[in-house]
Amino acid sequence: MYKKVNLSGIVISEPKSVKKFKTKDSIVNVLPEYYHTIADKRLEIRKDKDNCWFCKQDMNTYNPYFIETLYGDHIGVFCSKICRDSFANMIKSVIALREEPKISLLPLELYEKPEEVLEVINDLRHKEGIYGSCILESDKNIIKLTLRCHCNTN
């Protein structure tokens, strides 16, 4: 299908654009010898499916959403896309995600009245095409939550 080419000690056997990753292995720690690892554990991911991992609402009445990793694994259980994307935004620097989150809410512990955020989550649960984020207005010590959607969506 493709031809093997030798270039002065460099072997190109697969074009990069069609190369498939064969393993999930990655370099975990590359440290100079003067650093010593003081904690190295392999921990299982939580298996709780009763409550939303972001807002802690009971999942019995909602269709579950989950975060999909680059390798096709599923992480978490969420009551809405808003919760899923907000949680994904918090972990995307550590876990390779299949798609970029579109919404970024801060954890509910930061809000004086988290029930106001839960109301927004519940009101927009089934709405498609939502994107947005939160900004801390430090001079007023207020969190400005701004969510938008495209005009042609429900």
UniProtKB/Swiss-Prot annotation:
The keyword Membrane does not apply. It comes from the Viruses. The keyword Transcription applies. Keywords: Activator, Transcription, Transcription regulation. Pfam families: Pox_TAA1 (PF03295), zf-FCS (PF06467). GO terms for molecular function: zinc ion binding. Interacts with itself. Interacts with the late transcription factors VLTF-1. Acts with RNA polymerase to initiate transcription from late gene promoters. Belongs to the chordopoxvirinae VLTF-2 family. This is Viral late gene transcription factor 2. It comes from Fowlpox virus (strain NVSL) (FPV). The gene is VLTF2.
